[in-house]
Amino acid sequence: MFKAIFNILLILAICFTVSMIPLNTAFFNSPAINGDNPAEISTTSEYEVVIDSGGDSSSNYAQVEFTINGVFNKDFSDDFVLFDFIMNGETVKTLKASDFVLERDSSSTDGISSLDYSVNIDKESARLSSGAYSLRIYVADESAISMEEAFTDLLYMPNGTFESASSIENQSGLMNFILYYPDNQYMYLVPVTRTVPRQESVVRYLINTLSDGPKSSMGLTGGSPIPFIPYIWVSGNVSTLSLPAGDLGVYDDGSSVSLFAAEAITRTLRDNLGIEEVQVLINQQPAETALHGIDISTPWKTTGGPMAYMCLETETGKLVLAPAKLVATNYEEAIEQMFTAFKTGTANEVKSPNAFAFLPSSVELLDYKISESVITVDLSADITKLYGERTDLANMAVEALLNSLTTLMNVDKVVLTANGIPIQFEGYDFSEPMEKPAFINPER
């Protein structure tokens, strides 16, 4: 037994078999033992952290393999190896290697011991919510062995599936409505595409269909999101509707339900009929307020401004996209807020328990430019390759970016590149500018 504990050679080959996250190779520094005499400590050397996609398609499984070489204290155990899970710069949980299913092999050569670890850092054992984490691996107690810490990215995704807008087709005798319904937390309005038989009187048909509420399979708030609207008509890009006089029930009782009712009306009319203003009357007469005190003395504007399309998991395990309004005064602020939302699942410093991050922090926005209504966004990684066999998640990421970026003023089309190379994935070929999908979140 040596009297002193050495700074050791730590070769961490961290192989993440998280097939939906084949991240780029990262690096960390660690001290190296040099020469035949283990008492001779060399200067800090650079060692590679290898992150491999492997063959597993589970978004909740991460196999971490690493080797610790050095002179160990006889009391050393798996409890000394720690994992910090960091989100948004804060450590949300610290766990020990012994908290996970692991395998450990030991060997010794010339007085230097080696411990080979294989640890399953699975989401269930970690008891963490879906999202992007930075993983820190280290030994805190230097009396056991001195170990240089290492960092890498980890992305836990929900088990639910995403239905791509590309699955929606225009069919003879049918039409598609985009309808807005609150999620079960009343934090987001979720656009849902419903395919219905074609009819001539579209305006009344649209409002009645919205009032039917979402299908229970979508896992959203059930029932009608809006009060009964006895009269509605359209002239050009202006819609006028009349609410009944008197108590509107739940729509007059609380601010959340009332605000979501107003938003559901304006967004549904805008997305389906191109309505820019909505004039609200009471009993076909002008009034000052309605819906729990909302001002109706002037028409409501339907222009949305910049929005980040968040990824939500509903009560029934559906993964859906939902817009969150951003408070930004220029393109740079809006785009920065969008990518913060993509990486944290948080918009405007508000985090819904249904929302989750879908981009790891290692994916950087390298550059963007806007020209002739086209925005070109250059990323540090091909986002369609982050999720392995989970192509539904790749579609979700692409659709989130397309829907978000086209909410910017004077932006109609998008080009996505990875290190300057246009991204190509299934039906998406960004060698040419692409519009956002015509529909979103098919109702199934």
Question: Which residue ranges define each predicted feature?
Answer:
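Bimodal "functional hotspot" detector
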Residues: F2-R444
